[in-house]
Amino acid sequence: MRSATIVSAVLFSAFSAVHLIDDFLSGVPGEFNLTIPITLLLSFAYMLALVGLIVAASCRSPTSYLGLTIAGLLIFLAQLLKSIPEMIRPGSWHLGLPSEIAAIGLGLSAGMTAVCSYLAWRATRHADRRMS
């Protein structure tokens, strides 16, 4: 399950980067009254945390599996509750089809990461119990 976790998390980070760029180009930070420097700082912190969790997961850290589960679940829910309803409204969303592909890819990869990471976390816990 560790390999599936790493692969899905790498996809999650790739779609996150693309979606962040799309959000910048579409003026999303302005919707939340965020300045460009603050938005850049938040983007940096998000990507640093996500990549850090992937690195830790590659070392079989149970805590990183739990962190990726939570991150994946939160982003999956954000896409489901915010982006999908906006996309199904009439008219184009953000920059059209490329934006929609990025948002759907982000949601799916985040969901896959949440599931795979949770299963890896459970497997790690069960292995630890057997060792005790």
Where are these regions (language model features)?
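Interfacial segments of alpha-helical transmembrane regions
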Residues: 1-11, 61-72
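Core segments of alpha-helical transmembrane spans in multipass integral membrane proteins
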Residues: 14-18, 23, 35-59, 70-73, ...
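Interfacial non-cytosolic loop connecting adjacent transmembrane helices
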Residues: 27-35, 79-104
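Hydrophobic alpha-helical membrane segments
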Residues: 66-86
